[in-house]
From Swiss-Prot:
Gene Ontology CC terms, in alphabetical order: ribonucleoprotein complex; ribosome
Family annotation (PROSITE patterns): RIBOSOMAL_L23
InterPro entries in UniProt: Nucleotide-bd_a/b_plait_sf, Ribosomal_uL23, Ribosomal_uL23-like, Ribosomal_uL23/eL15/eS24_sf, Ribosomal_uL23_CS
Gene for this chain: rpl23
Taxonomy of the source species: Archaea, Methanobacteriati, Thermoplasmatota, Thermoplasmata, Thermoplasmatales
Gene3D superfamilies: 3.30.70.330
Family classification: Belongs to the universal ribosomal protein uL23 family.
Organism of derivation: Thermoplasma acidophilum (strain ATCC 25905 / DSM 1728 / JCM 9062 / NBRC 15155 / AMRC-C165)
Protein name: Large ribosomal subunit protein uL23
Complexes and interactors: Part of the 50S ribosomal subunit. Contacts protein L29.
Its job: Binds to 23S rRNA. One of the proteins that surrounds the polypeptide exit tunnel on the outside of the ribosome.
Presence of keyword Ribonucleoprotein: yes
Keyword terms of this UniProt record: Ribonucleoprotein, Ribosomal protein, RNA-binding, rRNA-binding
The keyword Ribonucleoprotein appears for this protein: yes
Alphabetical GO biological process terms: translation
GO terms, molecular function: rRNA binding; structural constituent of ribosome
């Protein structure tokens, strides 16, 4: 499988609240990506530890909600990648 797993970060009011209160990032990912691929990509690209991943397929594509370990800040990562 060639190319990046992560297509883009998702930026809405709800995702901003999730980043702030629940320490979660919301990302659009390739449709053929699985949880292990997403976890590896997030940990390597952003230098964080992932606690869990929820994945859902929507009309707009595959969405991954990634819960980060307590020692990392989802808000800080989101600011660094230009979501907020």
């Amino acid at each position: 499988m060639k190319g990046d797993i992560i297509i883009s970060p998702l930026s809405t009011e709800k995702t901003a609240l999730m980043a702030e209160k629940e320490n979660k990032l919301t990302l659009m990912v390739r449709r053929d990506a699985n949880r292990e691929m997403i976890k590896k990509e997030v940990e390597e690209r952003f230098g964080v530890k992932v606690e869990g991943i929820n994945v859902m397929i929507t009309k707009k594509g595959k969405k991954a909600i990634v819960k980060l370990a307590k020692e990392y800040s989802a808000e800080e990562i989101a600011e660094r990648i230009g979501v907020f």
